[in-house]
A protein has these predicted regions:
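Small-residue-enriched hydrophobic alpha-helices in membranes
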Residues: 27-30
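Arginine/glycine-rich "motif VI" loop of SF2 helicases in the C-terminal RecA-like domain
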Residues: 3-8, 52-53, 98-105
C-alpha cells in the first residue's frame, strides 16, 4: 500500500535479534523467530541511521515487539539477560527512545504480549519518545489497546 499509494515514500524493514539487519519486503513472509535475544537498541540505532540518510521530513519508526529488550552489544561482545527487565538494557533502550524524540522521529510500538510488567516498560518507552503504542497478543490481534502520548489518549479498539 505504501509503495503504490505513496510512491515517493520509502519503507525499510529491520529485523532484530542479537543484532539488527535490514530485510527486503519480499523476504518478510519468510522471517522466522530465531534463538535470539532482543537487541532493541541495535534495531532503533539502525533505523535512525537509515532515516538520517533520507531527505524526507516525515520520518517514523514502527516497531513490532514482545516488549522485552534482553540484549546489548558492547564492543565485540553481547550483554544478555533474559530474566526480567535488566536495568542496564532498559536504560540504554530508553536512551534510544529519547534520542529519537530529540531527532523528531516518533516511534509507534505494536506490542504483541500481555505481560503487565512488559506493558509497563512499553508505556515508559512510549512516554519517553512521546510516541504511540498498540497492545495486543498474537491470538487477539483483532482487539488492541491504543495509547497516544501525543494526544494523551488511551482506548480499547476492536
Amino acid at each position: 500500500l505504501i509503495t503504490t499509494k505513496y510512491p515517493k515514500d520509502t519503507l525499510d524493514i529491520i529485523a532484530f535479534g542479537n543484532d539488527a539487519w535490514p530485510i527486503e519486503i519480499k523476504d518478510l513472509p519468510y522471517l522466522e523467530v530465531g534463538p535470539y535475544h532482543t537487541n532493541t537498541v541495535a534495531g532503533l540505532d539502525l533505523a535512525v541511521d537509515i532515516l538520517r540518510r533520507r531527505k524526507t521530513s516525515n520520518k517514523q519508526i514502527f516497531m513490532i515487539t514482545d516488549g522485552k529488550p534482553t540484549c546489548l552489544k558492547e564492543g565485540l561482545k553481547y550483554y544478555k539477560n533474559s530474566f526480567g527487565l535488566d536495568r542496564k538494557i532498559v536504560n540504554k533502550t530508553l536512551d534510544e527512545a529519547a534520542k529519537c524524540r530529540k531527532l523528531g522521529i516518533p516511534i509507534t510500538t505494536f506490542m504483541i504480549a500481555k505481560d503487565p510488567y512488559l506493558q509497563r516498560f512499553v508505556r515508559e518507552f512510549t512516554k519517553t519518545n512521546n510516541g504511540r503504542a498498540f497492545y495486543s497478543s498474537l491470538s487477539g490481534l483483532g482487539e488492541y489497546i491504543f495509547e497516544d502520548y501525543v494526544r494523551n489518549r488511551r482506548k480499547r479498539l476492536k
